[in-house]
Design a protein with these regions (language model features):
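Active-site-adjacent structural elements that line small-molecule/cofactor binding pockets in enzymes
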Residues: 1-200
Length: 200
C-alpha cells in the first residue's frame, strides 16, 4: 500500500518555501507521494517543479489545477516542463473548479463544465502523448506542434463526482480525484463507473 499526503492552505505551511519544505520532509519521512492544491497565492505547478529539484523519490501531483486558469496548450506545456524536471514523478490533476470561483474571482462564465473538460482533456491528451494537436471544438480550438525531442509520460487525473465527469475520467484520463467521498460511495459508485467507462 502506498501512502501520500495532501497539502495546501494558509499560514507558514502555505508559503512557497513552506510547501517545498513539506515535500522535502515528506520524502525524508518515507511517504510515497504528495499532492498539492492550487489555492491561495501559489502557482502549484511552479512550486512542484521547484520541489522536484530538491527531491529524488517522492511522487508529486496537483489535486487539482483549475482548467479555467490556462488554455489547454499552456497547461500541456507547463505539465511537460514539470515532468521533465521531476524525471517522471509528476501527475497532473485537473478540475473545472466551482462556479463561485470561476465567475466571482475570474469574471468568466461557468458554462457547460462537462463540455469544457471533455474538450480540454482531448487537447491536453494529444499534446502530452503525441506532441501535436489539431482540434476544433465548441469551446476550445488548438492547432500547434511541440518540438521536444522526447515527451515524458504524464498521468492525468480528473476531479469527478457526477456520472458524466466520471465517465470522461474513465475514457480520457488515468483516474479520478475525489473530495470528501466515503468508502461505500467509492466502492459502489465511483470505481465501477470509471471502470465501465475505461473498458468501453
Amino acid at each position: 500500500m502506498k501512502i501520500g499526503l495532501f497539502i495546501g492552505g494558509a499560514g507558514s505551511a502555505g508559503t512557497l518555501h513552506g510547501q517545498i519544505s513539506q515535500i522535502v520532509e515528506a520524502e525524508k519521512a518515507g511517504f510515497d507521494s504528495l499532492w498539492a492544491a492550487h489555492i491561495m497565492d501559489i502557482d502549484v505547478m511552479t512550486m512542484l517543479s521547484m520541489a522536484a529539484e530538491q527531491t529524488t523519490r517522492i511522487e508529486i501531483g496537483t489535486a487539482v489545477t483549475p482548467t479555467f486558469l490556462r488554455h489547454p496548450i499552456a497547461m500541456a506545456q507547463q505539465a511537460l516542463t514539470v515532468q521533465k524536471v521531476a524525471n517522471g514523478r509528476f501527475t497532473l490533476g485537473l478540475g473545472v473548479n466551482h462556479k463561485p470561483v470561476v465567475e466571482g474571482r475570474l469574471g468568466m462564465k461557468f458554462h457547460r463544465p462537462w463540455r469544457h473538460m471533455f474538450e480540454y482533456l482531448n487537447i491536453v491528451h494529444s499534446l502530452t502523448r503525441e506532441g501535436k494537436v489539431d482540434y476544433e471544438g465548441e469551446i476550445f480550438s488548438a492547432n500547434t506542434q511541440f518540438t521536444m525531442s522526447s515527451l515524458p509520460e504524464i498521468p492525468v487525473l480528473l476531479a469527478a463526482l457526477g456520472p458524466r465527469m466520471l465517465n470522461t475520467a474513465g475514457e480520457l484520463a488515468d483516474g479520478t480525484i475525489t473530495w470528501m467521498t466515503g468508502t461505500e460511495t467509492l466502492r459502489r459508485y465511483i470505481v465501477p463507473t470509471i471502470n465501465d467507462a475505461a473498458h468501453r
